[in-house]
Curated annotation (Swiss-Prot):
GO terms for cellular component: chloroplast thylakoid membrane. It holds the Pfam family TPR_8. Belongs to the Ycf3 family. This is Photosystem I assembly protein Ycf3. It comes from Thalassiosira pseudonana (Marine diatom).
Length: 184
């Protein structure tokens, strides 16, 4: 049995015990069952099934904290499928419900960073007769803005989890966007 499979089984056993021991309404238990089914499907790579279960969980779950993790997991699926606008939408929703989600903040930053790199790539592509200097400048400005957004979200993630995301910390230092990283 692999480590991941063992962890999944332990999670299932512990979550079943918690549901039995803690008072929860039928609706809360059903929402959690959908969440667990979504996690299982996501682990298996069945993203359509995972999304279906996560959406059911969102419909039933009223707890903001629980909903934030469901939204985060939905964002993970969209990011995995390279639908970055949708991933950002769900990560932002997750953070709006739970501001203590450094992993969501990190993922938001990573998407903005990736988009910034793509904008720079567009700016540096070989000139074709159609592209004007003003367009190249626009791509560079777009990249700068996206990198600034990435920096802000990485800064927030590192503030919550100072020992995580060493590559982000290094990028912030190298690009001069570190603010006061050493204070945490």
């Amino acid at each position: 049995m692999g480590v991941r499979n063992f962890i999944d089984r332990v999670f299932t056993v512990i979550s079943d015990l918690i549901l039995k021991l803690l008072p929860a309404s039928k609706q809360e238990k059903q929402a959690f069952a959908y969440y667990k089914a979504g996690m299982a499907a996501q682990a298996e790579g069945d993203y359509a099934e995972a999304l279906e279960n996560y959406y059911e969980s969102l419909y039933l779950d009223e707890d903001q904290y629980d909903r934030s993790y469901t939204l985060y997991n939905i964002g993970l699926i969209y990011a995995k499928n390279e639908n970055y606008p949708r991933a950002l939408e769900y990560y932002h929703q997750a953070v709006s419900l739970n501001s203590n989600l450094p992993q969501a903040l990190n993922n938001i930053a990573a998407i903005y960073h990736r988009q910034g790199l793509l904008a720079l790539e567009m700016a540096s592509q070989d000139y074709d007769a159609e592209m004007e200097i003003s367009e190249e400048y626009e791509y560079i400005e777009l990249a700068k803005g996206l990198f600034d957004k990435a920096a802000e979200y990485w800064y927030q993630a590192l503030k919550l989890a100072p020992d995580n995301y060493p590559r982000a910390r290094n990028w912030l230092r190298i690009t001069g966007r570190a603010k006061s990283l050493d204070s945490f």
